[in-house]
A protein has these predicted regions:
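FNR/FR-type flavoprotein reductase catalytic core
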Residues: 2-3, 76-231
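Ferredoxin-reductase
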Residues: 2-91, 147-149, 174
Length: 231
């Protein structure tokens, strides 16, 4: 059952002109699984007979008793432009959560987890990071993450502090950065890790072409645990 809660913006961090990281304090805080998404509306009411216009965003943090959640929002249309204009520190909005099936495996606590993320598709992966560290099983975690430039490199500190060093693979597509390949993620990058494709859990999050490409490649080698989250 979903929860409707007012939320207050407690911090805003800009990553260039088109991406922002929002920290929200929920009025009503209930447990949600890492990888879930929510609906955010700027139409603030005490109750709704019909849910108003909204946009969905992956929750970029794991559940916390403090009721603080993180969202990563990219300005891509009229409504997200409104969010950028209207949501500042101290502003309120309403969220409806939690939804989705892009979730960590419930019954398998040992097989590797490989996340392939492009751009703001890193959001649910960040929630996985926090949850796996909390569960003490982050050693099974592999992350392939591509981003445009240093400004749009999201939450590197979290990734580096949780994902084992040799299992964190970063790619900068539009800016030459030290020690980071200046290109997109390629299929050869996945293959060279020698995953057991029948046992590893693969999570792909990015735009449609990004997601379809890696899904097709994984299916082609017999991968059986593939989860996608397109945007």
């Amino acid at each position: 059952m979903s929860t409707i809660s007012k939320a207050t913006v407690i911090s805003v961090k800009e990553h260039g002109s088109e991406i922002r990281e929002y920290m929200l304090q929920l009025d009503k805080n209930y447990y949600f699984e890492a990888g879930s998404f929510l609906l955010l509306t700027l139409d603030i009411k005490d109750s709704y007979s019909r849910w108003p216009e909204s946009r969905n965003f992956s929750i970029a943090s794991a559940y916390d008793e403090s009721g603080v959640i993180k969202l990563i929002i990219k300005k891509v249309g009229a409504y997200t432009s409104r969010i950028f204009d209207e949501l500042q520190v101290g502003s309120k909005c309403v969220v409806k959560y939690a939804f989705g099936d892009f979730l960590l495996p419930f019954f398998d606590k040992k097989a590797p987890i490989c996340c392939i993320a492009g751009g703001t598709g890193i959001a649910p992966v960040l929630s996985f990071c926090e949850q796996l560290r909390r569960d003490g099983i982050q050693d099974r975690f592999h992350v392939f993450y591509s981003f445009k430039n240093k400004e749009e490199l999201l939450d590197l500190t979290t990734l580096q502090s949780i994902v084992p060093l040799k299992q964190l693979h970063l790619f900068s597509t539009r800016e030459l950065l030290e020690f980071i390949p200046n290109r997109r993620i390629e299929w050869k990058d996945i293959i060279t890790e020698n995953f057991n494709f029948q046992k590893t859990h693969f999570y792909i999050c990015g735009n449609e072409s990004f997601t379809n490409y890696f899904k097709e490649q994984l299916e082609g080698v017999g991968a059986t645990n593939i989860y996608t989250d397109e945007w």
